[in-house]
Amino acid sequence: MAGLSTICGGKVIMGLGLGTFQHEFAAAGYPNTLKDRANLARINAELCRRLWKGEKVTYKDEYFDFADVELKPQPKNMIPIWYGGGTPASCRRAAEYCDGWMPGRIPMLTFIKMVGYLRDQYQAQGRPMGTVGAIPIVSIDKDLDTALSKVNTPGLIKEGNNPSKKTWVNFGKFKTYEDIRGLLLAGKPEDVVKDTKEYEKNGLNHIVYDLRFRYADWYQQIDYLGKEVLPAVRAA
């Protein structure tokens, strides 16, 4: 991360989360309980910041054991750490030891609710509000129906009713695109602009448009974003 910061003039953000797959932790020789993964995330953030500050660090616990480690080169500036996740627990962790919160696929109503909770958590920690991001799936086309037909909309609706999403607003009742709007931004360019501005109105500072459902016409989506969506978002 420090080397990347040097190369790009400090324009780098570190994303942090608990991970998903147990076999990844097993391959690295780490325990994979939720408690252990939460501890590892917090400790990694703390150690990175100490090293980025130029400290020579000695550290030992059940996860790490090293002595007199220092970092060269130093980052251009202190690298912000954003916590990835869309649950109340992710908001608490972001407020405790991160500089921002970056949920992935999250419906608009749930985003609004979580941002309010996140703000409360930062206040409880006595810290200024962190940066708020989102990574919505995007599908842009000549009309909404065509845009929805190019992505697995039924699958996304089904995902919204999965028990793992029990903290989402209206969990278990998702039936239509409108129920998952925000998780998916679809329609004409002006529709995506409107939804982006709604995100911004409700506390969003940073957005990443996820085009991975439109690999077949990736460059068309890039053109829509670059020529129609982004100029309108910036001008609004």
What do these predicted ranges mean?
Residues 1-236:
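Active-site-adjacent structural elements that line small-molecule/cofactor binding pockets in enzymes
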